[in-house]
A protein has these predicted regions:
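Asp-based phosphoryl-transfer active-site loop
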Residues: 3-18, 91
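Short, small/polar residue-rich loop motifs at catalytic or cofactor-binding pockets
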Residues: 1-2, 65
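Active-site phosphate-binding/coordination module
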Residues: 26-116
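A short acidic/small-residue loop/turn micro-motif
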Residues: 21-23
Length: 119
């Protein structure tokens, strides 16, 4: 018996450069829920970006965000991967040596861009 269906976004639910999920997908997610099957949006994207993409069903699905390092269901963090603070500072120090690069640091609900390169 199927209990969970997870799908990637870019190149799967969002094809050919699409920026919005096809509304038919939301109907399918609702049908899955009616049959007791959970849907999870899985992506390298940030959690809040995923919630925005799935606004019509955002409270009915699970999220596997940040390439799997952040999993949230019912606004509760199920699991998260954390980089040790010392390692994070070492990475930032290394990136700072290359002014043409930026570093994006993602948290559960916020991200920071560090660097001088034009994005």
């Amino acid at each position: 018996m199927v209990k969970l269906i997870a799908s990637d976004l870019d190149g799967t639910l969002l094809q050919n450069g699409a920026h919005d999920v096809n509304p038919i997908v939301f109907d399918q997610i609702r049908t899955l829920k009616e049959h007791g099957i959970m849907f999870a949006a899985a992506s390298g994207r940030q959690y809040l970006n995923l919630r925005r993409l799935f606004t019509p069903v955002q409270d009915d699905i699970a999220y596997i965000a940040e390439n799997g390092s952040l999993c949230i269901y019912n606004e509760e963090t199920i699991s998260k991967g954390i980089i040790e603070q010392d390692l994070a500072y070492r990475i930032l120090d290394e990136v700072a040596k290359y002014p043409q690069y930026n570093c994006i640091i993602s948290g559960e609900r916020v991200c920071y861009k560090i660097g001088r390169a034009h994005v």
